[in-house]
Amino acid sequence: MAWYWWRRRRRRGWWKPRRRRWRRRRARRRGPARRHRARRRSTDPNAPRETPRSKKKRPKKTQIQQSNSEDSSPGSTPVKKQKTKRRRYRRARYKNNFSSSSSSSDSSESSSSPLPKKSSKSGGGTASTPYYLPMHKQGLYV
């Protein structure tokens, strides 16, 4: 019939949850260590704590509220600081939007005057500043 040990185990109510033994749990809670701690604790509120504290230190709520509402009036809620979004494709914008004819003319103009001029020739490109070569490559074209 049931030659295999795993089949026999399954038939004996494996789906029923086991009963918890409450007596043992309560006995653990009421151990001698807990009574010991309660006895040691001093009544003085300014005395240092003997019980171990958690390693994470939480900032107190009163300190947070004071720091946020320094400038604002007491009735108003503190203003949230917004993080500025990073512009991801700033450098790529200038590399892709220039035409070869305008960049060569801009580079010749910029050598005579210190400020870069806005060229009207840029064929519909939205880039206002010309593309400059890196320092180690500039010697090739001058």
UniProtKB/Swiss-Prot annotation:
Superkingdom per UniProt: Viruses
Organism: Torque teno virus (isolate Human/Finland/Hel32/2002)
Region described as Disordered: 17-142
UniProt name for this protein: ORF1/2 protein
Skewed-composition ranges (Polar residues): 62-76
Biased composition (Low complexity): 99-117
Basic residues bias spans: 17-40, 80-94
Membrane spanning stretches: none
